[in-house]
């Protein structure tokens, strides 16, 4: 059972800070005028890592809650960003680059789902 224990708050805060910093760096390094590669990268990597974490947590029920909270709620919550993806897609639509917006939205959604499945499959294969 999850509680409002101080360790849980600290774990989420540290994880979220690290995830947000990584997303910020990816945006600075990779986002271009025509395509937000940094956001897409953050969401695809985050999708893969959430798959990995879900599989690992399922195979290790003895792990304390703060580990899941730090990794999933904190780090991956800070790394991935549905709101920035949405804003970037709407910006493309407002600029009239409809094909680019559709490609970006499709790549983000399908790619994130595929990467999550790949993360799950990776851990399941390694744990055999």
UniProtKB/Swiss-Prot annotation:
Residues engaged in binding fluoride 1: 43, 112
Keyword Cell membrane belongs to the record: yes
Cell location: Cell inner membrane
Function of the protein: Fluoride-specific ion channel. Important for reducing fluoride concentration in the cell, thus reducing its toxicity. Is highly specific for fluoride ions and cannot transport chloride ions.
Family to which the UniProt record says this protein belongs: Belongs to the fluoride channel Fluc/FEX (TC 1.A.43) family.
HAMAP family for this protein: FluC
Protein name: Fluoride-specific ion channel FluC
Species for this entry: Bordetella pertussis (strain Tohama I / ATCC BAA-589 / NCTC 13251)
Lineage start: Bacteria, Pseudomonadati, Pseudomonadota, Betaproteobacteria, Burkholderiales
């Amino acid at each position: 059972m999850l509680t409002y224990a101080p360790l849980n708050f600290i774990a989420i805060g540290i994880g979220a800070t690290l995830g947000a910093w990584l997303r910020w760096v990816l945006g600075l390094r990779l986002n271009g005028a025509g395509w937000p590669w940094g956001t897409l990268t953050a969401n695809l990597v985050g999708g893969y890592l959430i798959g990995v974490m879900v599989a690992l947590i399922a195979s290790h029920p003895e792990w304390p809650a703060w580990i899941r909270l730090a990794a999933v709620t904190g780090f991956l919550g800070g790394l991935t960003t549905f709101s920035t993806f949405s804003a970037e897609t709407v910006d493309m639509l407002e600029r009239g680059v409809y094909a680019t917006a559709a490609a970006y939205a499709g790549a983000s959604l399908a790619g994130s789902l595929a990467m999550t499945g790949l993360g799950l499959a990776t851990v399941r294969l390694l744990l055999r």
